[in-house]
Amino acid sequence: MRFAFDSNHSQSGAPFKGSRCFFNCQCICCRQGCCVVVVKCCCCFNLNCCNSLGSRKSFPQPAAMRKKVADLEVLRVSRFVAVILVLARWVTAVATLLTSCILLDIFSVPGQSGVADRSQASSRTVHVSVPTTPNETPSSTSETKLKLLYGYTSYDINNDQQVKSNNLCRVLCKSRNRKRQRRRRRRRNHRRRRHRYTKRLHHLMQDNMSGFEQRLNFSDAKCQSLETNYGTNYDLVQGGKLFSQSERSLLVSPLREIEAPWPAIHGSMRNCSKIKRNRANLIWLLIGLVWFEVKLINCNGISSSNYYASNLESHKGCTLCHESGKPNIYTDKDNPHTDYNIYNKYHSNNNFNKKTNQPHNNIAPSDEVRLESIKRQILTKLGLSHKPNVSHPLPKQFIWETIYRVDGGRMIPNNAFGSSGKNLDQKTIKLRAFASPGSHLFNGRGGRTDQRSERDPSHHKYRSPFDFTFNISKNNVYGKVLRNRSLERIDKKNSFLNGWTENRQLKINSQIASMPIELKSHHNSSPKELKSGAVRKVNGINGTQMNENALKKSTYPIDINHSIDNKTHTGKNGEMSHNDYEYFNDYSVQTHDKNRYHEGRSSIGYQPAIHNIEYENQKGHHESFADDHENIDHEDFFGNTQEIITFAEEGTQYRQYRILEFSAQNRRVPSQKLSIRSAQIHIRIDKPHSLWIEKAKSLPEKHLLNTKRKWGANKPHHRIKIWVFQLSTSINITEKGIDKAIIFRASFQVDPKNLGWQKFDLTDTIREWYGHTSHEKLRLLIDCTGCGGRYSLHLFQTSKLRGNSSDYLSTNPNRPFLVLHTESSRTRRVRRRAVDCGGALNGQCCKESFYVSFKALGWDDWIIAPRGYFANYCRGDCTGSFRTPDTFQTFHAHFIEEYRKMGLMNGMRPCCAPIKFSSMSLIYYGDDGIIKRDLPKMVVDECGCP
């Protein structure tokens, strides 16, 4: 090969026989018979100008064309080639970036639920470390730095979404100081790379120039043929390209020399390096934007929907919902059914018939069917066609206060309530912790202070938060003054009682003689025995003594203030007091029916006539046996009411008295006969804020002690007595015969020293009221003798709401209410041991726990308690090898199973079904009050095969 530097210089010898230029180029300098390389020729140094696929035909051009090739054209072509290379690199980088983003977006969505479910099924706690950059390898030093930076803590997570959010927060949310350090470090690295690149380029240019000068020394030598150097066979390489080592070096090195002087090359290289360095950060940024957009949509969907979602699962799957400060759907501690049921299904020891993992914020279709069935079952058992209208219900706090008062100060948790009863008991105790030591304490014993509670400091005393009784600071001194009565007053009272007329005395004796003998003997008991807090006994039907503890069958402990508990009902020898007789004369009560009169009078001693009670019991006993077969189905299906709380309604006005009206509750459930075990009315009695109490507060203690005799002589002994009358609904109170419509029911003595909520027994009145077939309201007239201006009854006085400046008037929350305790005649069966799926064999018929939350069902607005219950269901197989003969309930089932194993009854298979149920207690808002009802067969206790 020969180098020619002059365009006119050419090969002098004859061309090589049968051969042409190896490049098959159309250039004149290359078509002279052998390879003559011209340095300034573009076609000899640029591969793109050579037509390697062209034909071997020669197109000779005149020699003058070589002179027209200028240096400017060479520079333009080289710059054009450099621009094409830079654009190709940019296009490649952009295509790679878009492809990676699309692939990550496609593969991140389907794998999200699977990864989350696998992470939850495998383990609950995963220790996560901060991820390093793509170019950084994990090491002990980097882990130590990260631990020092973020603390020695581990994050407990249950799905992969939390890991992504934590990684993105650490990658994208850096502090300003770290960003500044990163920018400074990046600038230093850029300067160092630029300096190294310029030095390396300078060395390369020097090496190329030295090699080029060495090749110029052989310019006069002739070019040897390719056959002699390499032994080329043209039969094998026709139309192909063969490169020698010298040709490659000659083709590449001058191109670099030409491209190097172009100043734009350095800028393009720097831009490409920046793209490569920032490619990882840009990819993470795009992934974060796509991921955050999806999660924001999911958060909005969860927070705006009314579907069955749980607080725990929304916290796991949606981090931004809690970081943004928006309120969640469920914020209490109750456990919605989705959380417990999903955890119970996929974390039990039994691996039989497990379903595929479902998203945590949704409910499986099978669970939705169960929930709808449970809702229909509850409404049907309550005798309702739809959810009750609770647009304006009573406040739940007021309801719990009422239940607490009914309980008598101690809340007994029901097993059906679970943990909610315990929490409720603690909350109610805390609510009453603010009662001051000097305030009047109410212990649910009809205005008395239990001596057991005085001796035992552990006995819980409480005061209702609605009790705003005015408290005198010097109550001890004032109490001593009022209690110190002279003996002369007692003698005067006895002489006054003995001075009655003979007619009145005979009339009173005849009235008392008409009462049972046991009741008279009870009235003759000493006052010390009644005041000592001993066990008070009431004579039963057959002469046997019945204790007050016989009422312990109630859900709550009952201690009623019976009228026989007070000595003040009788005179000196057991006869009626003078004030009582005058009270009857004032009302002009006329009773033409003797039996009816005695029945009403006997309620004073809480002892009805013996023959009437025996007749009612025999009649009820006979009717219970007659209707036993008919009531079996109703008792097993409909709810069994145990307790009813009915608030008084404001009736008409009669003189200065307000009539109380109560609605019956026995019409809610079809074919259900309520049997009243006991009934009490709760009435609140307080002291008003009168002027003489204010003056008594300001009097010094010495002045009160000096004027003790004067107070005792002028101030009479105040006694409070409550009278209860029933008004007949068939007669209008505006008629002249109003006295005939009033029936006396009972009277009760109240101790003025212990005021507040009082409980009075009205069992006979309520039994007679519920015994009527018609659904008439109970109308009661309540009066107080001895109250005057000192004490007041809370009936229907309106008062402004506390803490509200508006003039809105609401009904007094201290209005009276009735508490009815019903009894159930259903027999209890012995409970057998149930097999849970947690400890059952593989495929065995077992009981699966299934929790139902009323809040998740949207029923927390009308169901007061409980917050939820375990409905449970059965699953498993009854045809496994574990089925032994003793597991069959009947011989017929065993016989059918043997035939099925023989192949004679292939179409029949036994099913795993519930065989034992239990009831659930429910307290809810009724149309007329608060009702507690036991719903039978609501909880699956045992599963088995037939």
From Swiss-Prot:
- Which positions form S-S bridges? C837-C846, C845-C912, C874-C943, C878-C945
Q: Does the keyword Transmembrane apply?
A: no
UniProt-annotated stretches for the region Disordered: 115-142, 174-194, 436-462
Q: Which GO terms describe its molecular function?
A: cytokine activity; growth factor activity
Record keywords, A-Z: Cleavage on pair of basic residues, Developmental protein, Disulfide bond, Glycoprotein, Growth factor, Secreted, Signal
Give the GO cellular component terms, alphabetically. Answer: extracellular space
Where is the protein found, in the record's own terms?
Secreted
The post-translation modification note in this UniProt entry reads:
Cleaved in vitro by metalloproteases tok and tld to produce a 30 kDa product.
Q: Which domain of life is it from?
A: Eukaryota
- The record lists glycosylation at N208, N217, N271, N389, N471, N484, N542, N561, N566, N732, N804
Protein's GO biological process: activin receptor signaling pathway; glucose homeostasis; mushroom body development; positive regulation of glycogen catabolic process; positive regulation of imaginal disc growth; positive regulation of neuroblast proliferation; R8 cell fate specification; regulation of imaginal disc-derived wing size
Gene deletion effect = Development of larvae with small brains and aberrant photoreceptor axon targeting.
Which InterPro entries does this one have?
Cystine-knot_cytokine, TGF-b_C, TGF-beta-rel, TGFb_CS
Record-marked site positions (Cleavage): N585, D586
Q: Which Gene3D superfamilies does the record cross-reference, listed alphabetically?
A: 2.60.120.970, Cystine-knot cytokines
Q: Where expressed (tissue)? A: Widely expressed in larval brains.
State if Disulfide bond is listed as a keyword.
Answer: yes
Instruction: Please note every region of biased composition (Basic and acidic residues).
Output: 447-459
Record's compositionally biased regions (Low complexity): 128-142
Record-linked CDD domains:
TGF_beta_INHB
Pfam families assigned to the protein according to its UniProt record, in alphabetical order: TGF_beta (PF00019)
Q: What family does this belong to? A: Belongs to the TGF-beta family.
Description of how the protein assembles with itself and partners: Homodimer or heterodimer; disulfide-linked.
The free-text function statement in the UniProt record for this protein reads: Controls several aspects of neuronal morphogenesis; essential for optic lobe development, EcR-B1 expression in larval brains, mushroom body remodeling, dorsal neuron morphogenesis and motoneuron axon guidance. Ligands Actbeta and daw act redundantly through the Activin receptor Babo and its transcriptional mediator Smad2 (Smox), to regulate neuroblast numbers and proliferation rates in the developing larval brain.
Q: What is this protein called?
A: Inhibin beta chain
Native source organism of the sequence: Drosophila melanogaster
Taxonomic lineage from the root? Eukaryota, Metazoa, Ecdysozoa, Arthropoda, Hexapoda
